[in-house]
């Protein structure tokens, strides 16, 4: 089976072609970072308009790169949600229209399921069951995964997600958009400076996350300290360590609760070097395994949508003719794949 994947949930237009026998045949991506940089964040209306401009040329390029004609496709997968409704509808309209015109089945994919399954694109793909840590700009959650569509959300953000906390803290430090990667780069220059940042919600049972208080603590620390480059780097390091430690503590709890020894990290924040190193050390000490996608598949992309959609299309699942976008969509409401 060969599937065209379309991702437009936020500020990246991602198109890919995936074949269940040959693997990933093509992967094209357009990022709107420069478009939104002047505003310090994603402007939904501008994002939607840019998706409209870029999506068809990218589809043509992806099909050309994959040496694939319309007749070679067995289905089309597009991101249905969660995300920005205008951006979602661009991908949904184009995907559903192509499916109708080409007489192909179509499937609306859950964006976070795409991230969750992204490590399956690697040669050392994880086997079920495992615990997944999904960390991005809009989501932080721990999921018990027993199979595709067999998900139990063990804990999630009650306010700011980890990626959102990175971006907002970067803005407090005067760093340019996108803030998260820039903050991590600054943190790499930091030194242990005796800051005692809190590890939110680790002093109580449970697997939920909360990073808004940590962001406020960081803002107060910035205001109280000298405004020089090394001090800012030290604060960035202390903030990053607090976020990473919090995520690691919760992951350890989730593994103990489930009895599983495999951990998947996915989503934009999974590209963070300190997070990868910390969780790799933790899993090594526990005698377990950790899996994550390559860097280009940590952020939003069409490859993960093509792969996730193919799994459901193979199981006979598909959408009706209606064009739908779901800006809010609980992961654990998805049907299982038999």
Swiss-Prot record:
The keyword Transferase applies. Its EC number is 2.3.1.234. It catalyses: L-threonylcarbamoyladenylate + adenosine(37) in tRNA = N(6)-L-threonylcarbamoyladenosine(37) in tRNA + AMP + H(+). Substrate binds at residues 134-138, 167, 180, 272. The keyword Acyltransferase applies. It is an enzyme of class 2 (transferase). One of its GO terms (molecular function) is N(6)-L-threonylcarbamoyladenine synthase activity. Keywords: Acyltransferase, Cytoplasm, Iron, Metal-binding, Transferase, tRNA processing. Transmembrane segments: none annotated. Belongs to the KAE1 / TsaD family. Required for the formation of a threonylcarbamoyl group on adenosine at position 37 (t(6)A37) in tRNAs that read codons beginning with adenine. Is involved in the transfer of the threonylcarbamoyl moiety of threonylcarbamoyl-AMP (TC-AMP) to the N6 group of A37, together with TsaE and TsaB. TsaD likely plays a direct catalytic role in this reaction. This is tRNA N6-adenosine threonylcarbamoyltransferase.
